[in-house]
Amino acid sequence: DSTVNTPEEMDTAMEAAEFGLEYFEGAFGPYPYDELIMSTGAVPSTGMPASLESSGMFTIQLERGTNYTLYHELAHQWFYCLVGNSEVTDCWLDEAFATWAAYLCMEAAGEDADTRWELCEMDAENIAGREYRYVNVPLDGADTFKIVFYERGAMFLRELEEAVGRDEFLNFVRGY
């Protein structure tokens, strides 16, 4: 059953969470809450992977071979309602920062972040011909939502980081 994790997978997830917590504290400042609760699972009625975050807590479906989702949801502890003015109208800010931060953490952990960035670029090229003028118009599917809100935003942040340098950009983010 893909919704059940082995004890070894849970140990690996705990190690990754500890690494991510230390990395994000070093990059963005102290963990902003008193405790952190991480749970794993799937949406009970569908068995589909569940990813959900709130202040001091996140739930994920563990992925084999990558800790991206774990790092992304953990990054939301710094970038959930702390960056955007509204998680409804400005959710792209929270998602872009969490995606960008997850890739930085993957890189620091020795995981393959380059392939993730390449996939972002390919996705962005795939929808480049489409026109999105208005924020309040529905997108044409979940993939487009992911590309626009998660990936394009993260690519924008990466461009800023590359333009000013990682240290300078991290200083800016910490100050923001």
Locate each region found by the language model.
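Juxtacatalytic substrate-recognition/specificity segment
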Residues: 1-90, 139-143
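Glycine-rich, acidic and aromatic/proline-enriched surface loops and short helix-turn segments
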Residues: 22-30, 42-48, 103, 124-126, ...
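A generic secondary-structure signal for well-formed alpha-helical elements
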Residues: 28-32, 78-82, 86-87, 101-109, ...
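Intrinsically disordered, low-complexity segments enriched in small/polar residues
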Residues: 29-31, 130, 148, 174
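Short linear capping/connector segments at secondary-structure termini
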Residues: 38-43, 121, 173-176
